[in-house]
Amino acid sequence: MVREKVKVSTSTRTRQWKCVESRTDSKRLYYGRFILSPLMKGQADTIGIAMRRALLGELEGTCITRAKSEKIPHEYSTIVGIQESVHEILMNLKEIVLRGNLYGTRNAFICAKGPGYVTAQDIILPPSVEIVDNTQHVASLTEPIDLCIGLQIERNRGYGIKTPKNFHDGSYPIDAVFMPVRNANHSIHCYGNDNEKQEILFLEIWTNGSLTPKEALHEASRNLIDLFIHFLHAKEENLHLENNQHDVTLHFFFPFHYRLVKLTKKKKEIALKYIFIDQSELPPRIYNCLKKSNIHTLLDLLNNSREDLMKMEHFRIEDVKQILGILEKK
């Protein structure tokens, strides 16, 4: 466990954030405590409420959403040689914590032979996904039988509630909890005199191990930026701001959006729709990803946001940075 003493300084007006406590309670329970200061009266609550909502509702997670076995007649049946009922096995699969960046649906498998215990370690996963806690229990095989279950893995946010209908192919949907943050709280400490009252925001984050609290904080912050960036763009367009007076602020806080907007403006006089991506010296893997998503010209590319690009199969955040670097040289 790492813990730092919180020092309140009234001599500086520079706003700073800091991790003051960090610990790992178990493989599936991480804790982090952060502070942000100094803030004016009322700002801590504004930031704390928004951040808590983003942490609990906006972050994506990876879960098992379906299990399939042709030998299972229905969800509430029992199988000879297995201690748990099918329903109990499904509930155990629901609790498995996964870590990974994937888009769309991926398949995984469990193939085990009894007698013995089946744990998360027995799940055969795609390369982009890994188990957080290999010891999580799935089933107990009491006889020398083979247990083979096909699994479906998805990445999403919030809750995934299964539809109440019968599946006759041995496929059973699993209610998924995609949220990597288990809980988040904020509190406020006030200091200073009545004339210059200031606040410190304390933010506590508990995660399931698929993200650290610091990673969750960064991701929630980026999601909030993505939500609010549209208002800044609208202000730029409607008021016709001159001389790029907000360039420094935008470049520091919103690097991707800033560079993309500047890049589009810079190339307005160029017939972007006639410049094809195969002229841009992109690496073969990135080029193939773009082509599969029907992105053929620079105009097609600039009309996609970072989120659009990240939804493409096998696309990474490093690829976005590489694309921007190549386009800025054009």
From Swiss-Prot:
The keyword Plastid applies. One of its GO terms (biological process) is DNA-templated transcription. Residues 270-330 are annotated as: Alpha C-terminal domain (alpha-CTD). It catalyses: RNA(n) + a ribonucleoside 5'-triphosphate = RNA(n+1) + diphosphate. Its main location: plastid. It holds the Pfam family RNA_pol_L. It comes from the Eukaryota. It is found in: Plastid, Chloroplast. The keyword Chloroplast applies. Its EC number is 2.7.7.6. One of its GO terms (molecular function) is protein dimerization activity. It is an enzyme of class 2 (transferase). GO terms for cellular component: chloroplast; DNA-directed RNA polymerase complex; mitochondrion. Keywords: Chloroplast, DNA-directed RNA polymerase, Nucleotidyltransferase, Plastid, Transcription, Transferase. Residues 1-235 are annotated as: Alpha N-terminal domain (alpha-NTD). In plastids the minimal PEP RNA polymerase catalytic core is composed of four subunits: alpha, beta, beta', and beta''. When a (nuclear-encoded) sigma factor is associated with the core the holoenzyme is formed, which can initiate transcription. DNA-dependent RNA polymerase catalyzes the transcription of DNA into RNA using the four ribonucleoside triphosphates as substrates. Belongs to the RNA polymerase alpha chain family. The N-terminal domain is essential for RNAP assembly and basal transcription, whereas the C-terminal domain is involved in interaction with transcriptional regulators and with upstream promoter elements. NCBIfam families: rpoA. This is DNA-directed RNA polymerase subunit alpha. It comes from Gossypium barbadense. The lineage of its organism: Eukaryota, Viridiplantae, Streptophyta, Embryophyta, Tracheophyta.
